[in-house]
Amino acid sequence: MLAKFAALAALVASANAQAVCSLTAETHPSLNWSKCTSSGCTNVAGSITVDANWRWTHITSGSTNCYSGNEWDTSLCSTNTDCATKCCVDGAEYSSTYGIQTSGNSLSLQFVTKGSYSTNIGSRTYLMNGADAYQGFELLGNEFTFDVDVSGTGCGLNGALYFVSMDLDGGKAKYTNNKAGAKYGTGYCDAQCPRDLKYINGIANVEGWTPSTNDANAGIGDHGTCCSEMDIWEANKVSTAFTPHPCTTIEQHMCEGDSCGGTYSDDRYGGTCDADGCDFNSYRMGNTTFYGEGKTVDTSSKFTVVTQFIKDSAGDLAEIKRFYVQNGKVIENSQSNVDGVSGNSITQSFCNAQKTAFGDIDDFNKKGGLKQMGKALAKPMVLVMSIWDDHAANMLWLDSTYPVEGGPGAYRGECPTTSGVPAEVEANAPNSKVIFSNIKFGPIGSTFSGGSSGTPPSNPSSSVKPVTSTAKPSSTSTASNPSGTGAAHWAQCGGIGFSGPTTCQSPYTCQKINDYYSQCV
């Protein structure tokens, strides 16, 4: 993800504070999800918390803000240790202040929420395991599925669902000054090594703090916080991408200044993490009719997103595979339509070919590539769900042409290059929202199924501004045939309308997922 800015209006100051106050009670909204096995799924009674960077932070002895607008009040504290001692984070009023609502297994995130004392912009939430710990997910060799409604998110917005290698307790045990922990949403990190957090590693980030020139609620400090990141879903109703971001150091770690790299530093590639990642955006890969309103995956209504993290015989991450389910039909991810880049999933060979075809800087392999990402996925990662706008690049990297002058790989969506300006998005689309629901996690093949009527749609032919000298015709949404006899491990091997191989390479067998999709397992 290119950036994830915290934004909260002046009267509700934001900070990743380490102390805790109780002027507002903290009650986590409940959010159910399902843990699945080959025999079925069981309900898990979970909850969510909002990130500490959105919370009201004030002096421990009263209600005076420690941070207002985009500046620290240095008359109250001026050093990292001093602010950690004198300031506290408080409880959250989830619906009225942040526009966060839950119902059963559904989470709704409102973009702009006008409360009695503040106007809140966006939010970042985490799935909890009890009151004091984040829920951990070991994704390698497993499958993660959720429903999403992006019909209320247009150009310049990102309704994101992703995983990061945060400490499950929010860093409370590692950093003894942190008295808030996961309960209050502390400990965030990602592959951008963000420097906009007010507290990192149990101390404040006030030293060297520079207010943003285009965000009235944010700034950057000397320190950043880094860890591995797996973007399962970055999307609005125009475009979507899924992207692994490996780091040479997997777990949360603090960085300093431009050595952080990422969006917040002058040297983007100077840190421990791959800020760009290896992304699969169907539009960018040459299919302009696969995702969007009225397209193969129709974003005007809810659909299901399935992501599989497939291991090879050595136990390393070999492939990140994507399916959609809509109106009871399984839809395979679109095939690449870029010369020299084949496939419809993320593999090491796909990433190598894409970097070459687009002429991108290959920091992905410098940071360990897919194998290093797999090491992070083998350990517990924290689920993040957010909605945000982009003060760094207006979200053009997701849904428009970026860089704006064009070139190989620049065409990412239909939004104008003049779109996504945060001040305009906030003023013109305040009621935007994203809804995540029906989260499921389990072994591959355990979390999704399709209906029993109709025929699955195919990917129609499409055209896109050329990313290489010659564009290939679009492929239909069927798995590529492997070499040898039968379909390869995890490939499609049957279903209504499927014309490929119906047997599997030894020792795998063809397992029916539903009437429209069978898979070699």
From Swiss-Prot:
GO terms, biological process: cellulose catabolic process; glucan catabolic process
Enzyme class name: hydrolase
GO cellular component: extracellular region
Originating gene: cbh-1
Enzyme active site: 229, 234
Enzyme Commission (EC) number: 3.2.1.91
The name this protein goes by in its record: Exoglucanase 1
GO terms of molecular function: cellulose 1,4-beta-cellobiosidase activity; cellulose binding
